[in-house]
């Protein structure tokens, strides 16, 4: 064998050993998560980038065939904004929430259940007939309560915006028991008038569902690497944090990060063993988070 051929053989051997080490590292996590429910909140740039959407679908299918029971909850902010602009409907944000008139809500429902949900289901089902769409309105899955917001010390009316106040996971459990991957859109009937639906935050909806399902983990995809103690100092990235530490840190966080970290806190406080925010811009970040020891992003654990 020539020197060049020997070098190539050595490289192949090293690559094979590296792959084997990665597979063995995943063994303990495969054991831990076997037949366990993992709730994944899909959002951010991953929703509008075709390649990231494709790799997300691959990850979800991988989880399913690896013996986990994944549940996807999605928002649709970018798509909703695009559709409102296309239809010439004015929309504004107050206190970080989209003011939702009845006209806006019809667009929200149309985009979430008729566009985003279908796109996610189609991406997953490219690998087999596995995914099924479920709306938060279906079979009493979510019940919401209207909320306002405080802006500059003044309470403002957000319209048809609410918080999830109760979850009946029966419809989702039925899909899981049938071997399917539920894809859940974040909209909820109003508890005071079930004929009226509310636009609810998808991060909070995912957390509430994770608690109701007794999930092993909540994973929220974001557009940042994780939680920073002192943004924009990239050296302040937090790999893991206890719930009590996060609770104290929460008021000082950037406004865009607060709902996501609050959702992680709600999940852990509700009995979910771990919750994490990860960078959805990195292909296959979900697999790195679940099946490697160091994970990726920021993990929240009980105090």
Swiss-Prot record:
Under InterPro entries, the record lists: AceGlu_kinase-like_sf, AcgluKinase_fam, ArgB, Asp/Glu/Uridylate_kinase, Glu/AcGlu_kinase, NAGK-C
Q: What protein name is recorded for this chain? A: Acetylglutamate kinase
PANTHER family linked: N-ACETYLGLUTAMATE SYNTHASE, N-ACETYLGLUTAMATE SYNTHASE, MITOCHONDRIAL
| Function of the protein | Catalyzes the ATP-dependent phosphorylation of N-acetyl-L-glutamate.
- Single Gene Ontology MF annotation: acetylglutamate kinase activity
> Mind telling me which residues the site (Transition state stabilizer) is annotated on?
41, 260
The record's keywords, sorted A to Z, are:
Amino-acid biosynthesis, Arginine biosynthesis, ATP-binding, Cytoplasm, Kinase, Nucleotide-binding, Transferase
Q: What's a single GO BP term from this record?
A: L-arginine biosynthetic process
**Which reactions appear under catalytic activity for this entry?**
N-acetyl-L-glutamate + ATP = N-acetyl-L-glutamyl 5-phosphate + ADP
EC no. given is: 2.7.2.8
Where does it localize? Answer: Cytoplasm
Q: In which pathway does it act?
A: Amino-acid biosynthesis; L-arginine biosynthesis; N(2)-acetyl-L-ornithine from L-glutamate: step 2/4
Keyword match Amino-acid biosynthesis = yes
Residues where substrate binds: 76-77, 98, 199
Family assignment from sequence similarity: Belongs to the acetylglutamate kinase family. ArgB subfamily.
Per the record, GO CC terms?
cytoplasm
């Amino acid at each position: 064998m020539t020197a060049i051929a020997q070098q190539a053989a050595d490289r192949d051997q090293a690559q094979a050993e590296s792959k084997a080490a990665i597979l063995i590292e995943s063994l303990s996590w495969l054991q831990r998560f076997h037949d366990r429910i993992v709730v994944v909140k899909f959002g951010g740039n991953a929703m509008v980038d075709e390649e990231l959407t494709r790799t997300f679908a691959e990850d979800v299918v991988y989880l399913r065939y690896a013996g986990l029971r994944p549940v996807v909850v999605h928002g649709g902010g970018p798509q909703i904004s695009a559709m409102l602009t296309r239809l010439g409907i004015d929309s504004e944000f107050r206190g970080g929430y989209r003011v939702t008139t009845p006209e806006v809500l019809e667009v929200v429902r149309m985009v979430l259940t008729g566009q985003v949900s279908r796109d996610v289901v189609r991406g997953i089902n490219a690998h087999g007939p596995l995914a099924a769409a479920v709306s938060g309105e279906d079979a009493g899955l979510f019940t919401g309560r209207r909320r306002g917001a405080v802006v500059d010390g003044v309470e403002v009316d957000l319209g048809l915006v609410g918080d999830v106040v109760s979850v009946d996971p029966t419809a989702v459990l039925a899909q899981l028991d049938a071997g399917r991957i539920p894809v859940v859109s974040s909209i909820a009937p109003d508890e005071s008038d079930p004929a009226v639906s509310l636009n609810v935050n998808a991060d909070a909806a995912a957390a509430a569902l994770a608690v109701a399902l007794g999930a092993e983990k909540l994973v929220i995809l974001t557009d940042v690497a994780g939680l920073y103690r002192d943004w924009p100092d990239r050296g302040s990235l937090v790999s893991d944090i206890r719930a009590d530490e996060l609770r104290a840190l929460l008021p000082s966080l950037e406004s865009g990060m607060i709902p996501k970290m609050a959702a992680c806190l709600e999940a852990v406080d509700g009995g979910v063993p771990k919750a994490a925010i990860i960078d959805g811009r990195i292909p296959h970040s979900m697999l790195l988070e679940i099946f490697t020891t160091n994970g990726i992003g920021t993990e929240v654990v009980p105090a």
